[in-house]
């Protein structure tokens, strides 16, 4: 499945605009991981624990969105948007949305 942030796909004609599709993932933050991430930030390293959590949550949300688009008969998603939000108690939410299309 083609997934893009653009409003179209170069060289492809959109045959049908199907529906808006989305996916969400909420991940809890581990307190020990948070502590080590903070220490790495202070000494100038990258916060690998946070990066890993972000990637995992984004992948889950994207997979959910793609599956929904596939169920609706789409073979591409255009105009995707990815949003990150920290919700209460250190939980991380990743929400993705886009327009399911058939090309």
UniProtKB/Swiss-Prot annotation:
InterPro entries referenced in this protein's UniProt entry, alphabetically: UPF0145_dom_sf, UPF0145_YbjQ-like
Pfam families linked: YbjQ_1 (PF01906)
Family in the record: Belongs to the UPF0145 family.
PANTHER family membership: UPF0145 PROTEIN YBJQ
Protein name: UPF0145 protein BC_1816
Organism listed in the record: Bacillus cereus (strain ATCC 14579 / DSM 31 / CCUG 7414 / JCM 2152 / NBRC 15305 / NCIMB 9373 / NCTC 2599 / NRRL B-3711)
